[in-house]
Amino acid sequence: MDLRIKDKVYLVTGGGSGIGGGISAALAREGAIPVILGRSPLQKGFRAEVLALQPLMHFIQTELTDGQACADAVQEAVSMYGRIDGLINCAGGNDSVSLETGVEAFRVSLERNLVHYYTMAHYCIGELKKSKGSILNVSSKTALTGQGGTSGYTAAKGAILSLTREWAASYLKDGIRVNAVVPAEVWTPLYERWVNTFPRPAEKLETIVRNIPLGHRMTTVEELADMAVFLLSPLSSHTTGQWVVVDGGYTHLDRTLTAR
């Protein structure tokens, strides 16, 4: 299927690994140009993979909690390509900042998981108006269910869902579409490392997947990335303000369905 995004330019925060890396690769596979923003250098293997798919890809090493750095990154992309067709806000991480951790840690968590979503959209919006582009925000099922012991992260992810609808409403007349994907249990290298911290990793993984109704398995990065790229593409041209949960029924389906 041709998603009709060839040669379009997409900024992907946190696009060098995990879910963001999957989205960058999926964009490149469709002929789009991913401009990857991240704090750490790209791993050589990943860079080579994306370059093989899209030689025009670009990486900007930047600190997303620095507003001026975000503005500079957007300007660098515009200077290189002359346009921005979409923004994928993905960077962040579950930092276990609980109600008892403290106010300053909570503020830092919001900076790392929420504020740069706004900052990047703020600096991209002028170019997105020109291109009638799209914004894709990556949230989390914790925004809908809670998790326990992670107030900062869940507050950020809930706010991301609210901003998705607010921005969709704000820019209807400009033809800018804004949607969110809501993952639950996605098998990324980071998730694998977390599972391996348990004394019996295989048993821990089994306790997780038995509660995922569809197939009793983890969501793959590719499955989530495919949905994200579809929502960015013209094939979803009448879809905006939506929260698309990609989780094998984990969040919403009756738990009795998980019985094997």
Give names to the regions the model predicted.
Residues 145, 229, 240-260:
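Short C-terminal tail/terminal secondary-structure segment
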Residues 140:
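Residue(s) in the substrate-gating loop at a strand-loop-helix junction
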Residues 121, 156, 164:
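Active-site helix of classical SDR
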Residues 93-108, 149-152, 192, 256-260:
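Conserved mid-core segment of classical short-chain dehydrogenase/reductases
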Residues 201-223:
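Catalytic Tyr-x(3-8)-Lys segment
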Residues 9, 16-18:
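Conserved glycine-rich cofactor-binding loop
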Residues 172, 177, 239-241:
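Short, small/polar-rich loop/turn modules that mediate ligand/substrate recognition or access, typified
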